[in-house]
Amino acid sequence: MTKVLFICHGNICRSPMAEFVMKDLVAKAGLSDKFEIASAATSTEEIGNPVYPPARRKLAEHGISCEGKTARQMTRRDYETYDYLIAMDHNNLRNMARFVGLSLIH
């Protein structure tokens, strides 16, 4: 199973949108049993909050539900568990590297 984690600052806009779009694409391809897809934040600012309403609406326009998703912060265990950690921008990548104690991430 391939494990993918999308990461942004607060885990209420970009990374959950990426998570649910990817889940939708994988499901439509009949590959849901081959992937584990999630998202997380580098900060603590939004922990426990739902997906930002405009992001939720945009997903819904495409028939994609993100119901029940709440923001969470990434953990060191995520780095050890997921095959791919995909940062939404360079700042997220830098914060992720600092968070998990790495000086270089590819």
Identify the role of each PLM range.
Residues 18-20, 97-101:
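Short amphipathic alpha-helical segments
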Residues 1-82:
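Conserved active-site segments centered on acidic
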Residues 89:
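Glycine-rich, N-terminal phosphate-binding loop of Rossmann-like dinucleotide-binding domains
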Residues 92-93:
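Alpha-helix capping/helix-boundary segments
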Residues 31, 101-102:
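Short, structurally constrained coil/turn elements
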Residues 105-106:
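Conserved small/polar residues in nucleotide/adenosyl-binding loops
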